[in-house]
Design a protein with these regions (language model features):
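Alpha/beta-hydrolase active-site loop signature
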Residues: 25, 52-56, 118, 249-252
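Catalytic histidine-centered segment of alpha/beta-hydrolase-like enzymes
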Residues: 245-257, 261
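Conserved alpha/beta-hydrolase catalytic His-Asp/Glu region
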Residues: 142-195
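Conserved serine/cysteine hydrolase catalytic core
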Residues: 175-235, 241-244
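Active-site glycine-rich loops that stabilize anionic/oxyanionic intermediates
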Residues: 23-26, 92
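The conserved beta1-alpha1 loop
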Residues: 19-23, 216
């Protein structure tokens, strides 16, 4: 089963669960602070922070490492939880996994996509930083005497300290110091699936009774003008809601946490409140 942790508001008795999915090379801890704020505002929800396959503590899962497999992992997790999964929120790669999961679960009442393109992206536009990070991890090796040595190597490859610190979250203690716990080849395979999958149908033909919300960074490049127009057309006929966070880049929740919390809290309102 996927590694996960559950966030609820103290004293609350939630009646449903929302899966929270990180982006590529992330982990379940990425959304912990914001999840506490979500739970405070929506105590009826439990927020299940997930380590997707080959990320965080969810290592060693059987291949193939595909988008379908990642969504299947979620189905297994959902079946094991005490609360019914009625919502799923994902950022970037995690959002694409959320869309794939939603395609197979019509009873899902809430779908929140954070800065991800529902369509295929053969040009890999907007994910340059993640691709560069994978190239760096391939180039610098997996074992390090100290965390600082790893940080220095990542920065020497052209990344800033913030990116280096983020990548260092994938280090674990080893006999000789630290080692990278992720299988870079497996992560590349997952990312290939992310770019290849076209899941516009999940947004454009959502089942009745589902609230779909897309939260986009105003300064992000994951969607071009025609794709934004296509999304606006879906929103105009009531098929989804679109929230653009001005000035925020791809990591919307990092650049604008307050705006992200407000958007997610609104997105998780009862469907009858539309």
């Amino acid at each position: 089963m996927l590694s996960h942790s559950i966030v609820t508001h103290p004293g609350a008795r939630p009646t449903r669960a929302c899966l929270v999915l990180h982006g590529i090379l992330g982990s379940k801890t990425n959304w912990r602070t914001l999840a506490r704020r979500f739970a405070a505002a929506r105590p009826e929800w439990a927020f299940v922070l997930v380590d997707l396959r080959e990320h965080g503590a969810s290592q060693g899962l059987h291949p193939p490492h595909t988008l379908d497999a990642a969504a299947g992992d979620l189905a297994g997790l959902a079946a094991a939880l005490d609360l019914p999964v009625r919502g799923v929120l994902g950022h970037s790669f995690g959002a694409k996994v959320a869309l794939r999961f939603a395609a197979d679960h019509p009873a899902l009442s809430h779908l929140v996509v954070v800065d991800a393109n529902p369509g295929a992206r053969p040009d890999r536009r907007g994910s340059e930083a993640s691709l560069a990070a994978l190239d760096t991890l391939d180039a610098i090796g997996a074992e390090w005497p100290t965390r600082e040595a790893f940080l220095a190597a990542v920065m020497a490859a052209g990344h800033d300290r913030g990116m280096a610190a983020w990548l260092a979250m994938n280090l674990e203690h080893a006999s000789a110091g630290f080692r990278l716990r992720v299988d870079v080849a497996a992560v590349r395979s997952l990312l290939d699936g992310y770019f290849q999958a076209d899941l516009w149908s999940v947004v454009e033909a959502a089942p009745a009774g589902r609230r779909t919300t897309l939260i986009l960074g105003g300064a992000s490049g994951v969607m071009d003008a025609p794709e934004l127009a296509r999304l606006d057309a879906v929103a105009a006929r009531g098929g989804c809601e679109v929230v653009v966070v001005p000035g925020a880049g791809h990591w919307v929740h990092v650049d604008a946490p307050d705006a992200t919390v407000a958007a997610v809290v609104a997105a998780l309102a009862p469907v009858s409140a539309r």
